[in-house]
Swiss-Prot record:
Keyword match Mitochondrion: no
Gene3D superfamilies, per database record: Extracellular Endonuclease, subunit A
Organism ancestry: Bacteria, Bacillati, Bacillota, Bacilli, Bacillales
Stretches the record annotates as Disordered: 420-448
Name this protein carries in UniProt: Type VII secretion systems protein EssD
Length: 617
């Protein structure tokens, strides 16, 4: 049987943009730089002192970490408080009125007992006694009136109806083996037009099932619509078959599933799809009946002249039958006019837009305040953290201008303490080409093996995500997957390095959503969600192993597909009994982008060291 359903759709782009704005401000004042700056300065002092054999240099620094961290924490708390208030406000002006009015709208068309429906004889002739001119009786009709009949009375007085019920029972019995004849007959004569569960009732029920995050309203067509040649048979059948599924005929089926509104599904569009009576809601119900009741063809026909097919039956509807159907529709339209659901939903768009605009203005002001304080106030606090003294021969002085900031401070320190006699790579090493590949000498073979570093905080697998939406990795951490793969993140929570001691073939799962969304706003149209360690090697399915990767390197494109080819090469070596060991991946980014620019992969195959540099394009 076909259920006529309507869904309420939510367009969440505006709200998602709002969340992105909040997150961008939080990112702008991320406190990790403040928390680490004291350690960085201490390390610099230590490095300089280790090279200053004659003790000619004296360096002192000011502690800035606690102050910067405090400021960062203040703004994060303020932003989270704001986000919480925004959520509550939107629930107040959108969710609550919407739910309340939906409940009111359905209250008038649900739980209508078939046993209380009276059919008033319109003066038909012969076997058409309750036929085309009959209509649902008004409120002043009484069961005792000579020209008024209940459905139960009509069914018992006409064996043709009894035969139809028997035939339908046999069909429904095929779907529900436990359906008894008595339950079916009771449902046919005493059932309700449809059953409705309010959102409040549904939420209480779902509390036992760990509430879901979205709401889905599926309305079953349940009004009594006379869509058959015989109006009484139509009334009974449509009331029964549209309100109850074949597998649950005796107990009924709820209109609302009751899933809880998601916090992210606030800005509601597409509200015209709500199934109000008289607006396409009833028409579908008749089609549902026709599809079920006459799918068996001629054996389901009744004496009133139904032909073999649904199309022929519809063409036989008489003018009187149409008048009676219109009478029912008018009653439904009156109901629709008496409810303010439509007006409420129309106004809702304006309220939601106003709320979003207010929040955008607030975010804009806060972003400017944050920018001003970070660029001005903090610079003054940390200017001249070092007092420059004498520098030994062979080292550059540590110079800090009046406008020294956290951003360039680390670069100055790094330049000052880096020895000038460092080893440079040869031409082959320095070439950054997507197809770059070479072997290196034995004295470099251990350079890519995993070495512990104090610059990363080790966390348990499962604790490596920040409590943010959308999901994001924590900054400056090291985590190990259940398969033994080690990952490190940078100060932005981006995967920076990956280490695998001994690669092996293991089947992994796939997370399609993560693969479609990783990289966020920096993702390009031609990007895939690329696994750093492939699923066939036991790589994680989540964003802790995924990056935005050009499909031209991630797939087997002719003359390209460099990442794909590397994975296939490893697979072939493992299948042939060779070892792929000591893998180190370095993932390079540009600025604050979440999309990598270059992948550098080092690995050993049977003791021979290899390096690949692959451009992400």
């Amino acid at each position: 049987m076909h259920d006529m359903t309507k869904d309420i759709e939510y367009l969440t782009a505006d709200y998602d943009n709002e969340k992105s704005s909040i997150q961008s401000v939080i990112d702008a004042i991320e406190g990790q730089d403040f928390l680490d700056v004291d350690t960085t300065m201490d390390d610099a002092v230590s490095d300089v002192s280790s090279l200053d054999e004659d003790g000619a240099i004296s360096l002192t620094s000011s502690v800035v970490g606690p102050q910067g961290s405090k400021l960062m924490g203040y703004y994060q708390n303020e932003l989270y408080d704001y986000a919480s208030q925004l959520d509550s406000k939107m629930k107040e002006i959108i969710d609550t009125p919407f739910i309340e009015d939906i409940d009111k709208a359905f209250k008038g068309i649900t739980n209508v007992k078939l046993e209380n429906i009276l059919i008033k004889n319109g003066g038909g002739h012969g076997r058409d006694t309750y036929g085309a001119s009959g209509k649902i009786a008004k409120g002043d009709a009484k069961k005792s009136d000579s020209d008024v009949y209940s459905i139960d009375e009509i069914l018992k007085s006409d064996q043709e109806f009894v035969k139809v019920i028997d035939q339908h029972y046999k069909e429904m019995k095929k779907e529900d083996k436990k359906l008894s004849k008595s339950d079916f007959e009771k449902m046919m004569t005493q059932g309700a037009s449809c059953d409705y569960m309010t959102v409040a009732e549904a939420e209480e029920l779902e509390e036992q099932k760990k509430k879901e995050e979205a709401i889905e309203i599926a309305a079953l067509a349940g009004m009594v619509v006379l869509s058959c040649i015989n109006p009484v048979a139509g009334a009974v059948a449509i009331g029964a078959y549209s309100a109850y599924s074949a597998a649950n005929a005796a107990t009924g089926k709820n209109i609302v599933t009751g899933r809880k509104l998601s916090k992210e599904e606030r800005i509601m569009e597409g509200l015209s799809l709500i199934p109000l009576p008289g607006m396409g809601f009833l028409k579908g119900a008749g089609k549902s009946l026709m599809k079920l009741g006459f799918k068996g063809g001629e054996k389901f026909a009744v004496k009133t002249g139904l032909q073999k097919t649904m199309q022929q039956a519809v063409s036989r509807i008489s003018p009187k039958m149409g008048m009676m159907k219109n009478s029912v529709l008018n009653q439904s339209r009156n109901f629709a006019q008496n409810t303010h659901v439509g007006q409420m939903l129309s106004n809702m768009r304006g309220q939601a837009t106003h709320t979003v605009q207010q929040s955008r203005n607030w975010i804009g002001q806060q972003a400017q305040n944050v920018k001003r304080i970070v660029n001005n106030g903090l610079d003054k606090e940390i200017a001249h953290p070092f007092k420059q003294q004498l520098a030994p021969a062979g080292m550059g002085g540590i110079k800090f201008a009046e406008t020294t900031t956290l951003r360039n401070m680390g670069q100055n320190i790094k330049r000052a303490v880096t020895p000038q006699n460092h080893v440079t790579h040869g031409p082959k090493d320095s070439m950054v080409r997507s197809e770059g590949k070479h072997s290196i000498s034995s004295h470099e073979m251990n350079s890519s093996k995993y070495v512990e570093s104090p610059n990363y905080t080790k966390v348990e697998f499962g604790e490596h995500y920040a409590r943010l939406r959308p999901k994001k990795l924590k900054a400056n951490i090291e985590y190990t997957t259940p398969t033994g793969h080690i990952y490190r993140t940078d100060h932005k929570g981006r995967i920076k390095e990956v280490y695998v001691d001994n690669l092996s073939l293991k089947d992994g799962d796939r997370n399609s959503h993560a693969q479609r969304t990783v990289g966020g706003e920096d993702r390009l149209p031609d990007d895939d969600g690329g696994h750093l360690i492939a699923r066939m090697f036991g790589g994680s399915k989540d964003i802790d192993n995924l990056v935005a990767q050009s499909k031209f390197i991630n797939r087997p494109f002719k003359e390209k597909g460099h990442w794909y080819n590397l994975e296939k090469e490893w697979q072939e070596f493992l299948n042939s009994g060779k070892e792929v060991k000591n893998i180190k991946m370095e993932v390079k980014y540009s600025g604050n982008s979440q999309r990598p620019t270059i992948f550098k992969v080092e690995y050993e195959i049977n003791g021979e060291r290899n390096i690949r540099r692959i451009l992400n394009k």
